[in-house]
UniProtKB/Swiss-Prot annotation:
Subcellular location field: Plastid, Chloroplast
Transit peptide: 1-51
Keywords from the UniProt entry: Chlorophyll biosynthesis, Chloroplast, Isomerase, Isoprene biosynthesis, Magnesium, Metal-binding, Plastid, Transit peptide
Key word Metal-binding present: yes
Native source species: Cannabis sativa (Hemp)
Name under which the protein is recorded: Isopentenyl-diphosphate Delta-isomerase 1, chloroplastic
Biological role stated in the UniProt entry: Catalyzes the 1,3-allylic rearrangement of the homoallylic substrate isopentenyl (IPP) to its highly electrophilic allylic isomer, dimethylallyl diphosphate (DMAPP).
Keyword Oxidoreductase appears in the UniProt entry: no
EC number: 5.3.3.2
Amino acid sequence: MTLLLNTTAKLYIAPRTLPFTSSSTFARSPFLRIPSLLKPLSPLTARVSLSSTMGDSADAGMDAVQRRLMFDDECILVDENDRVVGHDTKYNCHLMEKIEKDNLLHRAFSVFLFNSKYELLLQQRSATKVTFPLVWTNTCCSHPLYRESELIDEESLGARNAAQRKLLDELGIPAEDVPVDQFTPLGRMLYKAPSDGKWGEHELDYLLFIVRDVSVNPNPDEVADIKYVNRDELKELLRKADAGEGGLKLSPWFRLVVDNFLFKWWDHVEKGTLKEVADMKTIHKLT
């Protein structure tokens, strides 16, 4: 893993060490309580913005679970070549002011899980999500955290470890149902998308595909609804979103994948030839 020194940055303070505390599944998932074993990066590469550490008065109405995740989770900051340059809170990484002013770019992943009938599992994000509440999106979308197991670049192992963790956290899918070695990383994309006036996304997103029959028990703090769709059903969902029927909305990252890659890759899902289209060398800059 190559670290770049941000020569324009202020002197940064190494983060305090915290155990991982995710949403309500934390209470029922003992292994999620294991603290990170990662030693902090040097102070000059650790990005912490004290000015917004505690948020502001406008955040007072934020859901307690989402607020905790916003301040406890440390995202991995990268440059446009996906080289790690530091880390910062989930809160700061999703503030459009900081995204625009400091060009904060963080690493993310998007899981596309298909069952044995080659139907794609979609989720509707919960109403309490800070960014893009109640939009429909792919199976799971989140961030590798700044911890040893999720910083591993080789074979995208860090992103795959994070995907397994969040599939349990968001959808209650047991780790044994989604072995890390069953994820196929197909590509990376870089995009920016505002959610509202305050929040947004600026991500370098790992696109992970997996074909498994799984048990699902959605976490209501994260997920409002789920559904499996075949190709025709997804096309109908796209039509409704484009027409604005029933207020249906899709996440911008999901739409980018649909418009640029998904249906071509779906052919390879059905043929069992996903590795033939994998391209982890290219970073697709999409708008």
